[in-house]
Amino acid sequence: MAKKMKLSDITNMFVGMDVEALEGVTIEGDIEIDLGGLGGGFDPMLAAALGQESAVLAQHFARLAGMFGYPVGFGGAAAPAISPALAAPKLKDLIPAKFDVANIAEWTTEIQEVPIGNTSADGGSRGKRVLVGGEKALPFYFDAPMPNRNQVTIDVFDMRIGLAKAVKENYDEVMDSPGEWAKKNVEKFNADMITIHLISTDPLIKDTPAKEAAKTVEEVLQAVDVPIAIGGSGNPQKDPEVLAKAAEVAEGERCLLASASLNLDYAAIAEAALKYDHDVLSWTQLDMNAQKELNRKLMKQCNVPRDRIIMDPTTAALGYGLDYAYTNMERIRLAALMGDDELTFPMSSGTTNAWGARESWMVGSPLSQDTDWGPREYRGPIWEIVTGLSLAIAGNDLFMMMHPTSVAVLKQITQTLFGSIEAEPVDITNWIGAEV
């Protein structure tokens, strides 16, 4: 008669033998389950006990199978049954919600609105008047819509100068004629304004007399009917004289004289602006306190009205301090909105400074280990666009720019955010394989 063994007897045989698995072993036999005692009917207590013993038996089988090297995914206690969740009722309508525009209590002061350019109704000859400023919140916020969109003025120079190739190819045939250059900027590149830079007046360049430089201003005024900004050469000794003479020949046109600063005779420039009906660009170098000081002197010492002052806090290009320029402009705008009346003026950016960054115009990196910079024909305009757009978000109102593509893209983005043009849907589903 075959010997009877319990499963526990088999597993106990290997206790203390450090056996992890049995290979090549076959166990033959019959399994006998004694259900004696069921008697005359179903006993729930007995059924529960039988179920428990069956579970123990299953655990023994699982342990035994594991010893033979067979993977087992069960053997733990049975999980309690989970009642099916009640189905949520199907929504017929979306939960109602209302968007309330925030009322920021700290923003109590409106930015001064400044007009540039006089039409015939104002005593000038411009075909339109440009308005900048007037904001009651940071740009493009729902809190208070911008009353005036961003404006772009494209640079013109009174002599042929060295320009990045990507820029020069757009102007090469007109660079010897400031009037034709200005006309091309307006008619072909959709400039809102023109900035004429009288750089030949610098004593270290051509030392052009102020009276002769003023003729260039007259030429530009006759060539286009948009408002203009008049810039000097940056020479602190010569600029006050040059700008005063330019202001005289442009009397009544309400030009923007660029610029008054703390390192030159700002009082002479302010005097010319008041005498000949012009605005003043108040220029400082990334210093909020210096900006306050210059604005205060223009208002208190020189009696320049608030609606004739535009600030230029200086634009540092992408990669060359853009974060400083952005932070400075944003701090100025926030302080103005919160009531600092020495800073409540629109701002202008020399976005053209982006072309001073070598990454905008060089063919490639001078470092052999650098990755490819990509074609400069795209890279340069993108450099100018990113510089301008960053400062637009910080609160800048007026942009002095050069490349026509940069001008077009910046105007499209800012005017879309402003709400004056509708954005066109763009298919971005193929962005991985898209070619530029």
Curated annotation (Swiss-Prot):
NCBIfam families: cdhD (TIGR00381), PRK04452.1-1 (NF003375), PRK04452.1-2 (NF003376). InterPro entries: Ac-CoA_synth_d_su_TIM-brl (IPR016041), ACDS_complex_subunit (IPR051069), CO_DH/Ac-CoA_synth_dsu (IPR004486), Dihydropteroate_synth-like_sf (IPR011005). Belongs to the CdhD family. This is Acetyl-CoA decarbonylase/synthase complex subunit delta 1. The gene is cdhD1. Heterodimer of delta and gamma chains. The ACDS complex is made up of alpha, epsilon, beta, gamma and delta chains with a probable stoichiometry of (alpha(2)epsilon(2))(4)-beta(8)-(gamma(1)delta(1))(8) (Potential). Part of a complex that catalyzes the reversible cleavage of acetyl-CoA, allowing growth on acetate as sole source of carbon and energy. Probably maintains the overall quaternary structure of the ACDS complex. Gene3D superfamilies: Dihydropteroate synthase-like. Keywords: Methanogenesis. Pfam families: CdhD. One of its GO terms (molecular function) is anaerobic carbon-monoxide dehydrogenase activity. The lineage of its organism: Archaea, Methanobacteriati, Methanobacteriota, Stenosarchaea group, Methanomicrobia. One of its GO terms (biological process) is one-carbon metabolic process. The keyword Nucleotide-binding does not apply. Pathway: One-carbon metabolism; methanogenesis from acetate.
